[in-house]
């Protein structure tokens, strides 16, 4: 079963736009007209669909403000806005008549007559291809021959997309030719030839022995093809010595717009462009004397094969767009914009197909007609002021993207949404009135819940509110490919306001719950915490400390003995510490951080304080010889003073439960200037607590907790404020 993809374009058919009103969806075709609609009250909707002979399904939407349906052939009313929705089926399977099938086999050259000069004058793509060399001439001739059959296909100007289409169609051709030879029993082959040395390509597959015969005739076929193309090639342009010489943007023999060049193609093309622009063999990266005057000032003069910009600049503009700006600046500086290929947009291609639909053959049918989605615009009531005000809501779902527009004013024109698909990419352009609000967010995974949550859950939302009375703004969004649908939802202004108020109340409730989690020192001191006994004998508690989580999951308490400045880090290395950082509680309950050198602590001289903490969480400890040792801190937990005072007091009374856990009994410790010295039981290290100025220094060491999550859970339970007095909390692994 073949996969079918569609392209949906919604665009105003005329330049005049009226106020929001009823919408009539009609369908036109060459020789047939079908429409269906429904009326009710002051508004109505009419929709229809048909299949053109060219495989192009066109639906026209007309918005009227008088409550009447406007037919496609009635031109007496001009107060409506007409939109066209064109769905182009990519894989169109045609079933022609028996005479046409017979003509496909028996005709000798009837499909291709004339030369490139007989092509339409407005076919800019073919003329640019023909001027690019032998490969472009061959491509232009192939396009001209396909237009003899008036198929609704256009040349793909994007090289990446063109490559994917080539591989996909070659696989389809291979399957078709083998099916043809097997079902019909005829000698048939598919020959794909690309001229132009040295990149000559010659592929042939099909029924043998005809396939082998054509393989052996490769040289003869390619020579004849080159001669035939040389006769149809346009004359080479005259060289103008007044123009600066720059290379043309030609990728694999095909002129390619700079907007559609990939990053790899741009990186390979810019050095060649610099040779023409500067006249030097090498660019001279990094030297300001060799920097061209047209090089963008915001980009570093460095090799374009790597992005040497800062992280902030990388967030502003992608590297691919920066490379495209380099190319455009060079060609504009030398006055050679004529060498930048420009092709018609997708919307222009659609309009060209629509204009040619009346002259095309009606020998094609859509095997699977596409579904036409109706776009409805609700009209705000004008007669009864008690009715709720209607809000226009237009949503476009396209591969994980939702665009919602709200128009609260009744006299505001309806938004104009233009959606174009370029194979794997969908470009959405919304032209909106100045008072329209746009919300862009990621679409939810489940479509059935989208209507319930599209107003309250807006991750990565972008809100755009233009100034009232200003000019309409255009917002362009590019996403991954997907089936594009246009729908309309009836809602009221009160419903939109209620949804916004609900989201605001939820945010306030979350902030209030976070504020209620603050606990006092009395609550912390009266809490009882049970910790697994695996590391109690290794832990020395001090008035203040910083816990750092190691890469292996352990938590290290980095502490320093004033009598021995050499410490052992968790990774086994040693370092000399020149200062001790402590925290104490100052006036008003504020926590103050101080740094004392070991000279102030134990009277040693020639010691300086040099502790540096970088933004990425690393702490640098500098030794006497000036060598810095980085200490990686991936997670820092700050513990209040009152909590550590409570824990230190509780350490004196150790209780062992039946399950092997050790409980710390609650004990209240008053905050004072004088702090006592606590001596632990045998098996525990002696611990001294440093008090105010003049007191004995604290004894500190480097210890490690084996289970980082254990202590984190206990501290989280205490800080949550849910711990009651005399309760026991047992944290299990």
Curated annotation (Swiss-Prot):
Gene name of the encoded protein: ewg
Principal location class: nucleus
Entry superkingdom: Eukaryota
Subcellular location: Nucleus
Low complexity bias: start-end ranges: 18-37
GO cellular component terms, semicolon-separated: nucleus
Quaternary assembly: Homodimer. Binds DNA as a dimer.
Protein's name according to its UniProt entry: DNA-binding protein Ewg
Organism, scientific name: Drosophila melanogaster (Fruit fly)
